[in-house]
């Protein structure tokens, strides 16, 4: 098996910078691919938290002028993960999150900020760092979408390219007048290049110009080829369907392991499920919920947005309250949803608890202490919280979309009888169907034998990176074989 060098290009990587599941994936993939003979090094922007968190940083290149200022390319690491960091203070040394200011507005120069990331990635791909010349450049989401464009519209030899869609809803569209500023030739602005409805489309560029496309579940790979979920790119995705693959994400079993988790009140495994009770008690105390042990406690860990279906949860709260179900919600996002959930928590203390924001420790406690985890997304490319829920014995209640449908086995009569059910699915994604799913979940919870079977089935599921890594490794080798057969050996 011939060793492969690959460069991952992403705007986030756990544990240095995280706003969502993208960071978890890019953080776990290098370690997952290592047993397959693949050295995956990740290029990320030099945000303040990244610069502060990296180890053994060594400058390997200086860009005298990169979209408005000088920049350094650092070789570094974080634990076992090898990194390149683009240290460009004029682009990345800012408050707020990677994409927006503290008041929630997108940075006005995001086009340049993420073009710089892609430009650096392309140059690394073409041999900028002699000690690490990748066979493959693997870009993630719109922020890295121009990587393939810089490689395509260059006279230098280019490595193979892979582009992964984590969420098609965020596409990175910018005015065509920036084409020259971004260093792209006029010939790139066409339907077979970066042009997208008269603008420069970063996501579109990645989809159009990369050798292979992946997305983060088989179901989502099919859904985005239809107008309902294709976000205007379904035609292109149908055209490139023979180069499109859906590969499920996994979770890091070292980080998400209830038997060793130091962030929870009591550790446990599939054979010691009663020990979960201490976590339920701790979770109730943290959220100010009443301590009746027989009440169903549903957890939610989510961005508060229309996509995530949290408005539907608000509409079904009267049912939840009448059923005596408790709710512990951790999330942030839409200001109106944040205010609405705060209000219902104030109106129903003891039954509804809400923490606005994100807290990794609290997320672990919710997974370990909630009886069920609700994910009512209108669309969900893969989803990671339901994978963690399976691992922790929190029965997932999910919309039948994308990766949720690929990873949760609905507790219908046949699945229960066969001993394979792991959760509850509902479809279509409406208030009434969510309400029906909550009633069904409450009924299953009242049958403790069935409920424990759902928990145990979920905890025995393989939600690790083993299978996904094998699929990515095969994709890499097949791609290299198509370009240079001797590299596939």
UniProtKB/Swiss-Prot annotation:
E.C. no: 2.4.1.21
InterPro entries per record: Glyco_trans_1, GS/SS, Starch_synth_cat_dom
EC category name: transferase
Superkingdom classification of source: Bacteria
Pfam family, one: Glyco_transf_5
Family (UniProt): Belongs to the glycosyltransferase 1 family. Bacterial/plant glycogen synthase subfamily.
A biological-process GO annotation: glycogen biosynthetic process
Protein name per the record: Glycogen synthase
GO molecular function terms attached to this record: alpha-1,4-glucan glucosyltransferase (ADP-glucose donor) activity; alpha-1,4-glucan glucosyltransferase (UDP-glucose donor) activity
Annotated residues for binding of ADP-alpha-D-glucose: 18
Function: Synthesizes alpha-1,4-glucan chains using ADP-glucose.
Pathway: Glycan biosynthesis; glycogen biosynthesis
Chemical reaction(s) catalysed: [(1->4)-alpha-D-glucosyl](n) + ADP-alpha-D-glucose = [(1->4)-alpha-D-glucosyl](n+1) + ADP + H(+)
Protein source organism: Rhodopseudomonas palustris (strain BisA53)
Keywords attached to this entry: Glycogen biosynthesis, Glycosyltransferase, Transferase
NCBIfam families per UniProt: glgA, PRK00654.1-2, PRK14099.1
Gene3D superfamilies tied to this protein: Glycogen Phosphorylase B
GO cellular component: cytosol
